Every structure is written in structure tokens, then in C-alpha cells.
């Protein structure tokens, strides 16, 4: 058992133990190491000022991704290499991204600038030029209050890539890989001031720790837990970081009859899922693309989104409607739980105290099914939904054969709408049917008013989303018949 976190920052080794392990990464960088280029504005993942690149073992290499360091804790970083804005210089000179930002006047007060620079460096590390659209897309997680985005996007368009030195060349992977591989064999246990951290080396050790300490807070991407720690006073006595459970990071496909099913590991990030489904399902790709920002999607996971159990989380409606299943592993082995049985009440899960989510089985839509996923929020990116819906119909010769309907944001938990489903089966697929289904849906839900929307607004959405669904899909249906 190890009693320290092994972490490299800008190529230098750090062995961290005691109090500092329980600190946000930004505190450690700024106050312990004097790396003040990484800024903190919101401390909740919304602005990108704290963006750093995090490299984790991937085969014989390190895979670097941009993340928000304000919502990562040092205990999550065992066996990783962190690159801050200070570590991106080219031989003590500005790198091509920084040069372009200067030339194009991409900074005024400069507070947001390191975050933009790190996010852009990570975008350009593949050595390929980007369109304005791609640059904007890569920067949805970075806010600037004074320069305006035009100059920043222009800088992105003018980066001189002939001068770009890839991260892997600047920081050769060999040394890290050897150190990480030997350290990953051991679990980490650190106790300080009544708090205990456990970083298990395998799932068995994770379940045993959780069985002994049922109140353990699991941290995977940390994009929910760290916000609760930074802003809502969460101070867990027992924390377990899943970062070293390497076997949970894969997505594989299998067949269930004609249907393709994805098996998504419990540590698979939202970005990895977005990339995987991009050729398989336009709807799923879209709903993953509007999820948070790149920094959130590179850290956050599907398992975390499910276990966080928010009624307005973006992925559960798709999982409910596609009849997904959760694979939970505990000390007595593995069992499957239907997604529709997973929430027992507000933030109450059907998991035993020793269990964690190790896999999600997600059936994909068949070519003869119409599936639409809706996220209604005040802006397209980096916003929490007011209302979500997932509608799946199989229509044969104009008649609805099967229906699976799920809404989020209309009750304490995400819910299927059995009355609407029953009504739809056997009906003609028409605007009239969809309008009637909307009315039934309205009567089947009981939303509350909160900052994201009033009760009346949500009731109106519950009803009208069906007409939208019809208008969006009927044309395709007619062509297919
Ligand atoms: C700026 C910002 C934007 C966001 N945007 C969106 C958005 O657009 N849509 C949306 O739905 N959410 C959004 N979120 C919320 C969050 O990013 C997601 O819920 C994310 O999927 C959480 O994943 P994670 O791995 O970071 O979870 P964590 O924070 O690590 O954990 C979340 C919960 O799941 C539990 N948990 C984690 N892993 C497991 C496991 N393997 N087994 C059992 N329990 C586990 C944890 O104990 C915790 O209760 C946003 C958050 C932020 C900060
Ligand atoms: S400080 Fe705003 S995202 Fe980290
Ligand atoms: S330059 Fe001031 S916030 Fe962006």
C-alpha cells in the first residue's frame, strides 16, 4: 500500500501526501508551487480560467486532455502528468499559440488568457489547422469578459503550426510510463485529520473499501463532487478516487439479436462516448456535444452522470428510453440493474453500500426506429437543462408499433411515461396523435418551479415537445414508407 500520490507537473516528479492530497489542484499549483499562471475565477468549472492539460497512461503513451483544475482534487491525479501554462513555453519563448494571441490582440486584462492558451494548445497538439467553427467549439468552456471572442478566434486561425512542437516530443512519455506502470500496481491509502483517501488498484479492493466504509464518496471525474466540495461545503470523511481502475475505461460493442449494444466502462468519459457514438447515432452525438464544455466532457463520465441522480441530468433520458442496464459490482460479484429501476427516489440509487457502477449497457437505435433526444436550456452549451426528453417510436406502415417515452425535469427523478406509451401503441403516426399524446404527457407529470423554469413552462414543454417531434420526424417517416 502506498501513502503518497505520484504526480508529475511540467515534467517534474512530485510525491504528495498529508493535507495537500485533499486540496483542489488549483490551490496546490498556485500556493504550494507558485504556478500562478493557472487562474481561478468561478471554482465550479464554468469559465475555463484554470484549464490545464492532464496526461494519463494510454498504452505506451500518455493521452493529454484539457480539464478544469479548479474542480479536480490532488487525490484524483495519482499516476498522471499535469501541464500548466508555464509548461507550454517553447525553450523559454512564447509558443505559436501565445505568439498568435499577442499578434491578434487576443488579451486585454489577461485573466482568462492562460486558460484560452492551454485549451488552444491542446486543440492544436495534433498539428492540424482548425476552422473558426472548430476553434469556437473547442473554446466553449472558456469565458472572456473583456477582449471579446473575435480576436481570440482570429488568433486560433493564425497559429503558425510549422513552429509547433508536440507535447509528446517536449515531454517524452518513456520515463512517466515506466514510473506509472510500477506505481499503478499498488493501492494508495492516505489519512489526514480524520479524513481517509483510498485510490484502489483494482475493483475488488474498491468494493472491499466501500463495504468497510459505506459512507465513502466515490470520485470519478469529480465534476459534480468537486463542485459540492468547493461550493456546497461537502467534506467527506472517506473518499475513493477511481482514477487507477484502468479496466473500466473501454467501450466495446456486442450484438443482441439485430441490435448493437455498447458496453461502456464506469470510467469512460463523456468525450470518449461522444467520439464513439459520432458515427453510430446522430441524436446521441448531439446530446453529448451540448453537454457542458470540452473540459467537462474530458473529465466527467457517464457513470458519474447516472450516479449523481439529478432529475435534469442529460444522459438518463436516453438510457431510460433505450432500455439501458447498469452493471454494479460489489463484494459478492456483479449484477445488472435496469436503468428504469435505478432511481428509488430523489438522489436515491438502487446500489448496495459496497457497490459501484462498473459498466453501462446501452442498446443503440435500430434503423427502423425514430429516436429524438431533447435538451431544453437557456443557452446551447455549458448550461444545465430545464427539461429533457427522449422519444423512441417504431412506426410500421403509418402505425406506431412500439413507444418508449422518457422525461427529465418534471419530477424528483427522470421518468418513463407509461400512460403516453400505452396510448401511442397501435395509433396512426399523425400530428393529431402526437398532440393527444402531449396532453396525456402533461397530465402524467408534476414539475416544480425553480431557477431554470417555472412549473407552467415545464408543463407546456411536456405537452408541446410531441408536436415538435412530429414535425421533425414525419417527413423522414413518409420518405421511408
Ligand atoms: C460546468 C459544469 C457543466 C455541467 N454540464 C452538465 C450538462 O450539460 N449536463 C449534465 O447532465 N451534467 C452537467 N454537469 C454535471 C456533471 O459534469 C455530470 O453529472 C458528470 O457526468 C459527472 O461525472 P463525474 O465522473 O465527474 O462524476 P463525479 O463528480 O465523480 O461523481 C458524481 C456522483 O456519482 C458518484 N459516482 C461516480 N462514479 C461512480 C461509480 N463508478 N459508481 C457509483 N457512483 C459513482 C459520485 O460518488 C457522485 O455522487 C456539469 C457540471 C459542471 C461543473
Ligand atoms: S476557475 Fe472557472 S472553470 Fe475553473
Ligand atoms: S482578457 Fe479580460 S477576461 Fe478575457
Task: State what each model feature region is.
Residues 12-21:
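Short, contiguous acidic and Ser/Thr-rich linear segments
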Residues 41, 46, 66-69, 81, ...:
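The −1 position to Zn-ligating cysteines in a subset of zinc-ribbon hairpins
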Residues 54-85:
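S4-like RNA-binding module at protein N-termini
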Residues 21-52:
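A basic, amphipathic helix-loop patch mediating RNA/tRNA/ribosome contacts
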Residues 53-54, 66-69, 92, 96-102, ...:
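C-terminal structural segment of proteins
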Residues 35, 40-43, 63, 102-105, ...:
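Residue-level signal for mature regions of secreted extracellular proteins and peptides
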Amino acid at each position: 500500500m502506498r501513502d503518497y500520490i505520484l504526480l508529475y507537473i511540467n515534467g517534474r516528479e512530485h510525491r504528495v501526501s498529508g493535507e495537500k492530497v485533499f486540496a483542489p489542484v488549483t490551490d496546490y499549483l498556485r500556493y504550494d508551487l507558485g504556478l500562478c499562471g493557472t487562474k481561478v475565477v468561478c471554482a465550479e468549472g464554468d469559465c475555463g480560467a484554470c484549464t490545464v492539460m492532464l496526461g494519463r497512461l494510454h498504452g505506451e503513451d500518455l493521452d493529454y486532455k484539457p480539464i478544469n483544475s479548479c474542480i479536480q482534487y490532488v487525490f484524483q491525479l495519482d499516476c498522471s502528468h499535469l501541464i500548466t501554462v508555464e509548461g507550454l513555453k517553447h525553450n523559454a519563448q512564447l509558443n505559436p499559440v501565445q505568439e498568435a494571441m499577442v499578434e491578434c490582440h487576443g488579451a486585454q486584462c489577461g485573466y482568462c488568457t492562460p486558460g484560452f492558451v492551454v485549451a488552444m494548445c491542446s486543440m492544436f497538439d495534433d498539428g492540424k489547422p482548425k476552422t473558426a467553427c472548430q476553434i469556437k467549439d473547442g473554446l466553449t468552456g472558456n469565458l472572456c469578459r473583456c477582449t471579446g471572442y473575435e480576436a481570440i478566434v482570429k488568433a486560433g486561425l493564425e497559429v503558425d503550426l510549422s513552429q509547433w512542437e508536440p507535447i509528446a516530443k517536449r515531454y517524452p512519455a518513456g520515463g512517466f510510463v515506466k514510473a506509472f506502470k510500477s506505481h499503478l500496481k499498488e493501492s494508495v491509502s492516505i489519512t489526514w485529520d480524520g479524513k481517509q483517501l483510498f485510490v484502489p488498484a483494482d475493483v475488488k479492493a474498491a468494493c472491499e473499501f466501500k463495504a468497510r466504509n459505506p459512507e465513502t464518496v466515490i470520485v470519478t471525474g469529480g465534476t459534480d463532487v468537486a463542485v459540492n466540495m468547493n461550493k456546497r461545503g461537502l467534506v467527506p470523511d472517506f473518499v475513493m478516487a477511481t482514477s487507477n481502475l484502468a479496466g473500466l475505461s473501454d467501450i466495446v460493442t456486442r450484438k443482441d439479436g439485430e441490435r448493437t449494444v455498447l458496453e461502456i466502462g464506469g470510467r469512460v468519459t463523456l468525450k470518449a462516448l461522444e467520439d464513439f457514438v459520432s458515427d453510430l447515432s446522430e441524436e446521441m452525438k448531439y446530446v453529448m456535444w451540448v453537454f457542458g464544455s470540452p473540459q467537462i466532457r474530458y473529465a466527467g463520465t457517464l457513470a458519474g452522470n447516472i450516479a449523481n441522480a439529478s432529475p435534469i441530468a442529460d444522459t438518463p433520458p436516453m438510457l431510460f428510453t433505450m432500455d439501458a442496464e447498469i452493471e454494479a459490482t460489489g463484494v459478492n460479484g456483479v449484477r445488472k440493474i435496469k436503468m428504469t429501476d435505478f432511481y428509488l427516489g430523489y438522489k436515491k440509487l438502487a446500489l448496495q453500500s459496497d457497490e459501484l457502477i462498473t459498466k453501462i449497457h446501452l442498446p443503440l437505435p435500430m434503423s427502423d426506429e425514430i429516436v429524438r433526444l431533447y435538451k431544453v436550456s437557456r443557452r446551447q452549451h455549458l448550461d444545465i437543462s430545464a427539461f429533457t426528453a427522449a422519444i423512441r417510436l417504431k412506426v410500421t406502415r403509418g402505425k406506431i408499433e412500439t413507444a418508449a417515452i422518457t422525461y427529465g425535469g418534471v419530477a424528483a427523478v427522470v421518468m418513463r411515461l407509461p400512460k403516453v406509451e400505452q396510448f401511442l401503441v397501435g395509433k396512426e403516426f399523425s400530428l393529431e396523435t402526437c398532440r393527444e399524446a402531449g396532453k396525456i404527457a402533461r397530465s402524467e407529470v408534476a414539475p416544480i418551479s425553480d431557477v431554470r423554469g417555472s412549473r407552467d413552462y415545464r408543463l407546456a414543454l411536456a405537452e408541446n415537445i410531441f408536436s415538435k417531434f412530429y414535425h421533425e420526424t414525419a417527413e423522414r417517416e413518409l420518405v421511408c414508407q
